Amino acid sequence: MKLLPLLLLLAAAIPVAHAQKASFETEAVKKTVTAFFDGMRHGDSTAVRRTLAPAAVFHAFSNQPNQPTKLGIESINGFLKSVGTPHPEIWDERVQFERVLIDANLASVWAPYEFYLGSKFSHCGYDSFQLVKLADGWKIAHVIDTRRKEKCR
C-alpha cells in the first residue's frame, strides 16, 4: 500500500517530462528558422546554409489572376548567392510562429510573415517549413511560401 503513492507520483511526472522535452524541441526548431532569417538579414549566406539539410528544396509558385497556379523549384545555390551578394537594403523577413508541430525527427512550421526591404514593406504571406532532426540538430529540408502585397494579417 505504501508503494501506491509513489507510483501515482511517478505517473503524474511522465506528462510533465514529455511536455518539457516537447517545449525544448519546439524552441530548437524555432531557433533554426530564426537563424535562417538572421542570416538573411545580415547577408550571410554561410549562416543560412548552416540551417539547411543536405538536398533541401525550396518551392515557389506563381498565382497570377486568370492563370493556373504554377509550381517550380527555386535554386538553393541561387538563393544563397543572392543572400550573400551585397544589396543596398536589408532583407528583413519578420515571422511569427503560429504553429510548430513535431513528431519524432520531423517538424512542420506554419508562420505568417511580412517582408521588408530596409524599412519599406514589400509583401506578406505564410511560410511553411519542414525540418528534420539530423545528428547536428534541426535542419530545414523544405520551404514553400505564399506572397501578396495586401490583405496581410
Model feature map: region roles:
Residues 3-13:
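Sec-dependent N-terminal signal peptides
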Residues 17-50:
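Short, low-complexity N-terminal intrinsically disordered segments enriched in polar/charged residues
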Residues 34-38, 52-66:
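Short, solvent-exposed secondary-structure junction/capping segments
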Residues 36, 48, 56, 109, ...:
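Hydrophobic pocket/interface hotspot
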Residues 43, 51-53, 95, 104, ...:
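Extracytoplasmic
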Residues 71-118:
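Surface-exposed, charged secondary-structure patches
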Residues 123-149:
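Short beta-strand edge/turn micro-motifs at domain boundaries
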